[in-house]
């Protein structure tokens, strides 16, 4: 489905499950992003403020696609005037989960962010949370996406997460 349908679905899902999406949960972090351009706090805010509303049992039912769509819906709500967004972006190295590229004519132009989500079931959580850094194969995967973007858009500053 296209991005509009994904947003409609996520909005419906949030209402159906009484997931609170008010601005107080998110706006302060997005304002800070405007000043420092650090994506990690946006991801942390998403996990704590959005996913943190779900009961633990839900996490065995949701998948990586849900994570991508709900993250897209939240980020695009606050940054759509600065970035264009792509979910499952095709490139020569594969399909990146989430990409956001600065819109020409804005201060964000040439800013490109690549995010690769890795979803693990509860039984693998302890092992994954004990890692101090990403697995090398995951790093190489994202670097491949970044290199592809740099080839297509050499003037872009590609940041990975």
Predicted regions and their residues:
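Extended alpha-helical interface modules used as scaffolds for assembling large macromolecular complexes
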Residues: 1-120, 125-126, 135
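Nucleic-acid nuclease catalytic cores
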Residues: 131-161
């Amino acid at each position: 489905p296209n991005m509009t349908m994904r947003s409609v679905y996520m909005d419906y899902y949030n209402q159906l499950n009484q997931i609170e999406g008010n601005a107080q949960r998110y706006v302060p972090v997005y304002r800070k992003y405007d000043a420092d351009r650090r994506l990690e706090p946006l991801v942390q805010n998403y996990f704590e403020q959005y996913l943190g509303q779900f009961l633990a049992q839900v996490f065995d039912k949701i998948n990586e696609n849900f994570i991508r769509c709900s993250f897209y819906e939240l980020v695009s709500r606050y940054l759509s005037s600065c970035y264009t967004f792509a979910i499952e972006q095709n490139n020569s190295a594969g399909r990146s989960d989430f990409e956001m590229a600065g819109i020409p004519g804005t201060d964000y132009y040439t800013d490109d962010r690549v995010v690769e989500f890795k979803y693990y079931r509860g039984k693998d959580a302890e092992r994954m949370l004990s890692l101090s850094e990403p697995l090398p194969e995951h790093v190489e995967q994202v670097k491949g996406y970044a290199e592809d973007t740099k080839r297509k858009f050499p003037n872009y500053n590609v940041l990975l997460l």
